[in-house]
UniProtKB/Swiss-Prot annotation:
Motif PPxY motif 1: positions: 346-349
Family of the protein in this entry: Belongs to the arrestin family.
Broad class of the protein's primary localization: cytoplasm
InterPro entries assigned to the protein according to its UniProt record, in alphabetical order: Arrestin-like_C (IPR014752), Arrestin-like_N (IPR011021), Arrestin_C-like (IPR011022), Arrestin_domain-protein (IPR050357), Ig_E-set (IPR014756)
Segments of this protein annotated with the region Disordered: 393-414
Organism name: Pongo abelii
GO BP field: protein transport
Protein name in the entry: Arrestin domain-containing protein 3
Length: 414
């Protein structure tokens, strides 16, 4: 669309990665160009850019205020991370239409470079949620005398690195629960569940190895299952709004009375989802692995193991099973070479998330009926996706995982 003699106004970023996607982190320099194409000479008062990053939360609730009276309560909150303005052409005052200070731009294409530095302090990862978002953008404004300004806004992605190679994220997660079913005056045997995963931190594209034992001493047929859930929490005016959504799930074999099932590293793959957001005061994004037993006619028995979805994959010697790493010192530059004896590295964000996926959310995933009842509502997979390119690191999976378990008495004979 031609606006006067301005044919086009665009913004392009100088990307820091090979995938040509504008992705930045705190402390990075964001640079780019405002591209202006005109079909004839134009007079310009100013060409400005405005860059901003902020988290914003908003939701409404309906309340009763007496007989046949209701009102809507709005909850909003905002956190600003940075606010940068710069003038590429002209001067600050746009209301001055005097001939002095006008700049003439000739017909053709013109580029005007801009640059600014993101704060060194941690920034929240870009995110689009049900009741809030974290967004970063650059807006260009072209002001001309006696004409409306031409404006354009373009977003860029910011993410904070979460390195899963930290002691807290490399520690195993485990738990045990038991449930006894009662029906009037009759009590059946217990249903017991024990589950363990090798660590707390993972990256998208990895598969979680689940080690579990389910013992059914009840009289009912039960089904062991597992699911990854994302929890979005939004905070405003002292209130909190939470949304829980299914990310991935799996189902085990039905387990009849007196039987036991063991999972020796059953795999559940993490789809392309946004990293955990843990440092924003008004938006929090967390993940959990739920290993549970579907019990017909009763509340399910479930075990909740916390997860952190990071951006930097597991180091080759980050695994607890690497004994060589603690016994020798060497130049780590050799890691860039091929290591045929090691398992394949977890895929990078660029491999996991395509450009098409980045533009479109995941299709809704149908949730399990039992968890719909527990959460009192349907679940929707509304996951913000990114196309990241973390360092090309490798991971190591223990070829002989510890499968030992505590000896438990078998179900009592009936």
């Amino acid at each position: 669309m031609v606006l006067g003699k301005v044919k086009s106004l665009t913004i392009s970023f100088d990307c820091l990665n090979d995938s040509n996607v504008p992705v930045y982190s705190s402390g990075d320099t964001v640079s780019g160009r405002v591209n202006l194409e005109v079909t004839g000479e134009i007079r310009v008062k100013s060409l400005k850019i405005h860059a901003r990053g902020h988290a914003k939360v908003r939701w409404t609730e309906s309340r009763n205020a007496g007989s046949n009276t209701a009102y809507t309560q709005n909850y909003t909150e905002e956190v600003e991370y940075f606010n940068h303005k710069d003038i590429l052409i002209g001067h600050e005052r746009d209301d001055d239409n005097s001939e002095e200070g006008f700049h003439t731009i000739h017909s053709g294409r013109h580029e005007y470079a801009f640059s600014f530095e993101l704060p060194q302090t941690p920034l929240a990862t870009s995110f689009e949620g049900r009741h809030g978002s974290v967004r970063y953008w650059v807006k260009a404004e072209l002001h001309r005398p006696w004409l409306l300004p031409v404006k354009l806004k373009k977003e860029f992605t910011v993410f904070e690195h979460i390195d899963i190679n930290t002691p807290s994220l490399l520690s195993p997660q485990a738990g045990t629960k038991e449930k006894t079913l009662c029906c009037w005056f009759c009590t059946s045997g217990p249903i017991s569940l024990s589950a363990k995963i090798e660590r707390k931190g993972y990256t998208p594209g990895e598969s979680i190895q689940i080690y579990a034992e389910i013992e059914n001493c009840s009289s009912r047929m039960v089904v062991p299952k597992a699911a990854i859930y994302q929890t979005q929490a939004f905070y405003a005016k002292g209130k909190m709004k939470e949304v829980k959504q299914l990310v991935a799930n799996l189902r085990g074999e039905s387990l009849s009375s007196g039987k036991t099932e063991t999972w020796n590293g059953k795999l559940l793959k993490i789809p392309p989802v946004s990293p955990s957001i843990l440092d924003c005061s008004i938006i929090r994004v967390e993940y959990s692995l739920m290993v549970y037993v579907d019990i017909p006619g009763a509340m399910d028995l479930f075990l909740n193991l916390p997860l952190v979805i990071g951006t930097i994959p597991l180091h080759p010697f980050g695994s607890r099973t690497s004994s060589v790493s603690s016994q020798c010192s060497m130049n780590m530059n050799w890691l860039s070479l091929s290591l045929p004896e090691r398992p394949e590295a977890p895929p990078s964000y660029a491999e996991v998330v395509t450009e098409e996926q980045r533009r479109n959310n995941l299709a809704p995933v149908s949730a399990c009926d039992d968890f719909e009842r527990a959460l009192q509502g349907p679940l929707f997979a509304y996951i913000q996706e990114f196309r990241f390119l973390p360092p090309p690191l490798y991971s190591e999976i223990d070829p002989n995982p510890d499968q030992s378990a505590d000896d438990r008495p078998s179900c009592p004979s009936r």
